[in-house]
Amino acid sequence: MLWANVAKAIIIISTIGYIINISTTGIPVLKESYSLITQHQEYPELHFRLLNNETELELYGGIEVGSEKQLEAQLDAHPNIKLLHLHSIGGRMLGAIRLAGIVKQRKLDTYVKERCASACTVVYLAGVNRLIGENGELAFHAAGIGGTSTHNNEALSSSLKTQYINAGVPKWFLEKVLATPNEDLWIPDHNDLRKAKIITQVVNS
């Protein structure tokens, strides 16, 4: 009788754990997947502008899955581009990861004159040299998936965490980023950005 009750207790605990896991990870992921499948656009349209005799390219707007194809087309059409200006509120993490891959592959420098926030920072960190204007801001927070902040969920935040670790972001800085709820923004000053080696140079804008 004792072992039967223990078995029942284990089943109940496992069921509760499954329900909690589904509600904290499964549902947000399902929502995000549905949004991708239906191609629901949540962010401002992405635009590009050529600068400095076609040696620089400005990316502004929201980042979506597929933005990487737009960037690649611009770089193929204008092979002298060496510097990518970023002015974005962020967007989908998968789109940002793919954009970062292209920036690395093409060995581009990155530059922020005004603000690069959220997923945009993943793209910025892919630059060989990472420049920022004297009034430029990099704004960080934990990722959001399916309308849910991942700041208190290690499983959901793993993708963003991996990107930052691969970019060489130090632990103290990363912990601050991942502890910032998705609805908030942490904007470190240039001294902190230098200390963390996020930026390589502050330039006149």
Show which residues each predicted segment covers.
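Terminal peptide-recognition signature
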Residues: 59, 84, 124, 193
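Charged, glycine-interspersed solvent-exposed loop segments at helix/strand-loop junctions
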Residues: 142, 146-205
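STAS-typified acidic loop motif
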Residues: 30-70
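Glycine-rich beta-to-alpha active-site loop
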Residues: 104, 108-145
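Hydrophobic membrane-insertion alpha-helices, especially the h-region
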Residues: 4-24
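Extracytoplasmic/secreted envelope proteins and their assembly/folding machinery
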Residues: 68-75, 96-100, 104, 121, ...
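Acidic/histidine-rich, surface-exposed loop or edge segments in extracytoplasmic proteins
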Residues: 51-59, 79-83, 140-144
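Short, glycine-/small-residue-enriched flexible loop/hinge segments at domain edges that mediate gating
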Residues: 80-95, 109-115
